[in-house]
A protein has these predicted regions:
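Soluble regions of membrane-associated proteins that transit the secretory/organelle pathway
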Residues: 2-7, 31
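Short, isolated positions in well-ordered beta-strands
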Residues: 12, 86-88, 101, 337, ...
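Long, hydrophobic alpha/beta structural blocks
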Residues: 14-326
Length: 386
């Protein structure tokens, strides 16, 4: 799925667009025990509650593609004959009316997801009459292209509110508000099947994870029967480690600055092009980039080999997972420097009197702890004002 396809399905989760007739739910306590289950018809809910329910579900299709939204492919063998794929198909094809399939799915999630507190599992089914899209991009609402039938799973923490004072308007007084339990933003979930090329793709699901640093290995293994992808934050850390270890003494400030600048440039160009397909690079692409930066060929080769070992051969990585586009950071054991990436080229390293230094040009407006300071030349005497 690309960004346009995700946005198209996300827009379905509105009261005037959705064909969702009911939502299945399972409330689980901190002991992994089912507290309650429900099958809630949306038509019986007040409009505000219906919109809140759809809003919670919609968030499962939010975030950045490749970071929060990750494609989970199924092998041909899984699609032909596997318990995990058969269960997902049963949920979809029955429109969540297969009680045994719903029960088995809830049990799978509970056995594989163990947060500290209570949580809510939501299942929704929607049937989308996909409108025809002409070659010029215009959508013809009255001309259907195909029917897309899918299920969306959302897992949300349920948290207790804190005691607070509330204002009672009729009595014109303040009282303690009762402690309550509220449904928080989704922690993880998935869409099945994927909406690839604007049609159902039973060979793929779109997995959602709110945190870019979390990896719910057991959940992914239970639901998709596959290895969990490396979280975005771990990709960034691993990429930096590979860069430093493989280049060794060739990993200079200039090289890191250039790599950061070029990756950020690729991200900006992709954003400006409005290409819906995700931007990716491979270890081979990075090897070419490093060679262009002046890195010796054998070290660039070592980098490519390390990428294949850590990420997989010919793995397609999102540059957004590898660099911070809004900051450029330098750390020593004692000092931390953060610079707007636009001005990172101002920083340089130099040996002075045999000691290594990090140099930053100081213009006007220098402050220390909020106090503006003056930087004087050592060969110029300070003159007192009369």
């Amino acid at each position: 799925m690309n960004e346009k396809e995700i946005s198209e399905i996300r827009r379905r989760f509105r009261a005037d667009k959705s064909n969702i007739t009911h939502v299945r739910g399972c409330y689980v306590n901190e002991k992994q025990e089912i507290v309650s289950q429900f099958d809630q018809p949306l038509s019986l809910l007040p409009q505000e509650e219906c919109e809140n329910m759809l809003s919670v579900l919609r968030r499962t299709l939010s975030g950045t593609l490749g970071k929060n939204l990750i494609e989970m492919p199924f092998t041909t063998a899984q699609v032909v004959d596997s318990d995990e794929h058969r269960l997902l198909m049963a949920l979809r094809d029955s429109k969540l009316t297969d009680e045994e399939a719903v029960r088995m799915f809830f049990e799978k999630v509970i056995a594989s997801y163990r947060p500290e507190g209570t949580y809510l599992i939501l299942l929704a089914n929607d049937t989308y009459d996909v409108p025809y899209r002409a070659k010029d991009g215009e959508t013809l609402e009255d001309a259907s292209e195909n029917i897309y039938n899918y299920v969306l799973c959302t897992v949300c923490p349920v948290k207790q509110t804190k005691p607070v004072l509330g204002y009672d308007v009729p009595e014109n007084t303040f009282h303690n508000r009762d402690i309550d339990w509220i449904v928080s933003a989704p922690q993880l979930g998935f869409l099945f099947p994927s909406f690839t090329d604007r049609s159902a793709d039973i060979y793929s699901a779109m997995y959602y994870c709110r945190s870019a640093s979390e990896s719910y290995d057991e959940f992914i293994d239970a639901v998709f029967n596959r290895e969990a992808p490396m979280p975005a934050e771990e990709q960034k850390t691993t990429f930096g480690t590979i860069l430093g270890d493989s280049l060794n003494d060739a990993c200079s400030l200039d090289v890191v600055q250039t790599v950061h600048s070029r990756l950020c440039g690729m991200i900006e160009e992709h954003k400006a092009s409005k290409d819906p397909e995700p931007l990716t690079i491979t270890g081979r692409t990075m090897k070419t980039m490093l060679t262009a930066c002046g890195v010796p060929g054998e070290k660039a080769e070592k980098f490519e080999e390390a990428c294949a070992e850590q990420f997989g051969a010919d793995a397609a990585l999102s540059p957004r997972n590898l660099v911070e586009t809004k900051k450029f950071e330098i750390k020593t054991p004692e000092v931390q420097i953060r610079v707007d990436p636009e001005y990172s080229e101002w920083i340089e390293t130099r040996y002075i009197d045999g000691a290594p230094y990090i140099l930053i040009p100081a213009g006007a407006g220098v402050q220390v702890n909020g106090v503006p300071i003056a930087i004087t030349r050592p060969d110029v005497e300070y003159e007192e004002e009369e």
